[in-house]
C-alpha cells in the first residue's frame, strides 16, 4: 500500500501538518467559545468594576482580579419620593428637579433586581475563564492565575491594562467589557479617597453630602486633577487606586467624573450596599474597616511597591493613613491630607495624629495649588 509520505513530498507534508494544526486550533477555539453556556439573559446587564493584577513572588505567574455586577434594570418605577424621604432630601426637591436627569441616573442602580447564582464566562485574548458564582447582591469575583507570557500577550501597553469581555448568548450582540490594571512588582501606587479629596462632597454636612452625592453635578476639588497628573508622570508605572466609602452604585457616575475632569483612571474599591441586608447600614457607618482592609490587601499583594496615600480631614483618613504608615514605615512614600471643615468645627491635632512619623513624610494642605509648586 502506498504511504502518504510517498504521495506527498516531505516539505509539502510538513506544510499540510502545520496548516492542519492551525485549522484544528481555530476550530477548538471556536468550539470553546460557543460551547460555554452563558447565563446572561437578554434583560440582564453586567458592569465590570476595574480591578488589579500583580505578579506572584516567582515572577512567572500573575494573579488577575476580576469583579463584576449582574442585575436586571427596573426602568419603569419612579422612586423619587421614597428616595428623598429616606435620605432626608425633601428640602432639595426643587434643586433635584432642576437636575432631574442627574438625579434619576444616580438613583437607578439602587433599585435594580440583583441576579444571584450566575457564573459569568469572560474572554481574555483567546482564553475563556468562568468566574465564581454571583451572590445575592449580584456581585461576582474571580482570581485568575495566568503566566507572565500571557500577560505580556494580552496587555494593552498604552494603558498597562488587560481588557476582557463577557461571553453572551448566541444572537446577543451586546458587549460587556472590563479591564484589569496591572501593577508591576516595583513602582509607586497612589491610594486616593474620593469625597472631599478629589470631589467636593461636604461630608461634614450630612444633608449637603446627600445632595452632592445624589442630586447635584459632581464638582472637583480645585487643582487636584493637575496634582494627580503630576504624580502620574513623576515615576514610570505609577498607578491609582480609588478607595472610598461610597457605594458601588455610584461607580458609573464616579468614573465619568474622573474622565470629565482628567483624573488618572485606576482601580476602584467601593463599599457594597443593598437595601435587603445589613449592608444598607454601611452608608452610615465608619469607613475605617473598609479602607484599612483594602489598603492592606494592596500592600500585601505587591510587597515591593511603594505607596502614596491621599485623603482629607473629614472622615478619618488622617488617622487611618497614620496607622498604615506606622505599620509599614518603609512602604509609605508620603501622606497628603486635604484639610476640610469637620462636623464639630475643631481641627485635627496633626502632630498628635502623626506622632512618631517624620514631618517630611506627611503634608496637610487647604489649597492643592501649593502641592503643584513642590
List each model region and its residues:
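C-terminal cap/substrate-recognition subdomain and adjoining C-terminal extension
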Residues: 38-39, 246-374
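Short, surface-exposed connector motifs at secondary-structure boundaries
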Residues: 233-241, 300-307
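Asp-based phosphoryl-transfer active-site loop
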Residues: 189-201
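Intrinsically disordered, serine/threonine/proline
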Residues: 31-179, 370-374
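Short, acidic loop-to-helix structural element flanking the phosphoryl-transfer center
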Residues: 214-238, 248-252
Amino acid at each position: 500500500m502506498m504511504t502518504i509520505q510517498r504521495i506527498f513530498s516531505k516539505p509539502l507534508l510538513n506544510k499540510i501538518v502545520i496548516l492542519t494544526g492551525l485549522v484544528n486550533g481555530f476550530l477548538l477555539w471556536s468550539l470553546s467559545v460557543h460551547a460555554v453556556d452563558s447565563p446572561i439573559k437578554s434583560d440582564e446587564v453586567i458592569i465590570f468594576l476595574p480591578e488589579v493584577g500583580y505578579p506572584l513572588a516567582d515572577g512567572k505567574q500573575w494573579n488577575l482580579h476580576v469583579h463584576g455586577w449582574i442585575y436586571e434594570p427596573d426602568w419603569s418605577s419612579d422612586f423619587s419620593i421614597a428616595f428623598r424621604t429616606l435620605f432626608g432630601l425633601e428640602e432639595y426637591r426643587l434643586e433635584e428637579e432642576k437636575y432631574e436627569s442627574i438625579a434619576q441616573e444616580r438613583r437607578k442602580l439602587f433599585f435594580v433586581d440583583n441576579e444571584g447564582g450566575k457564573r459569568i464566562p469572560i474572554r481574555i485574548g483567546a482564553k475563556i475563564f468562568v468566574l465564581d458564582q454571583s451572590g445575592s447582591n449580584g456581585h461576582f469575583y474571580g482570581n485568575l492565575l495566568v503566566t507572565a507570557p500571557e500577560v505580556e500577550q494580552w496587555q494593552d501597553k498604552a494603558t498597562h491594562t488587560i481588557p476582557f469581555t463577557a461571553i453572551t448568548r448566541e444572537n446577543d450582540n451586546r458587549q460587556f467589557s472590563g479591564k484589569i490594571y496591572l501593577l508591576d512588582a516595583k513602582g509607586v501606587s497612589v491610594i486616593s479617597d474620593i469625597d472631599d479629596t478629589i470631589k467636593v462632597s461636604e461630608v461634614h454636612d450630612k444633608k449637603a453630602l446627600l445632595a452632592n452625592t445624589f442630586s447635584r453635578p459632581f464638582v472637583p476639588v480645585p487643582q487636584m486633577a493637575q496634582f494627580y497628573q503630576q504624580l502620574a508622570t513623576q515615576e514610570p508605572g505609577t498607578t491609582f487606586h480609588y478607595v472610598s466609602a461610597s457605594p458601588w452604585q455610584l461607580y458609573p457616575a464616579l468614573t465619568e467624573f474622573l474622565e470629565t475632569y482628567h483624573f488618572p483612571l485606576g482601580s476602584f474599591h467601593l463599599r457594597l450596599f443593598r437595601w435587603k441586608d445589613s449592608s444598607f447600614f454601611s452608608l452610615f457607618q465608619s469607613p475605617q474597616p473598609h479602607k484599612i482592609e483594602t489598603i492592606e490587601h494592596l500592600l500585601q499583594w505587591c510587597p515591593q511597591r511603594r505607596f502614596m496615600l491621599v485623603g482629607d480631614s473629614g472622615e478619618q483618613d488622617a488617622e487611618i493613613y497614620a496607622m498604615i504608615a506606622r505599620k509599614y514605615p518603609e512602604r509609605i512614600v508620603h501622606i497628603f491630607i486635604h484639610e476640610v471643615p469637620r462636623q464639630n468645627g475643631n481641627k485635627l491635632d496633626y502632630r498628635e495624629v502623626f506622632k512618631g512619623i517624620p514631618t517630611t513624610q506627611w503634608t496637610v494642605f487647604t489649597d492643592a495649588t501649593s502641592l503643584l509648586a513642590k
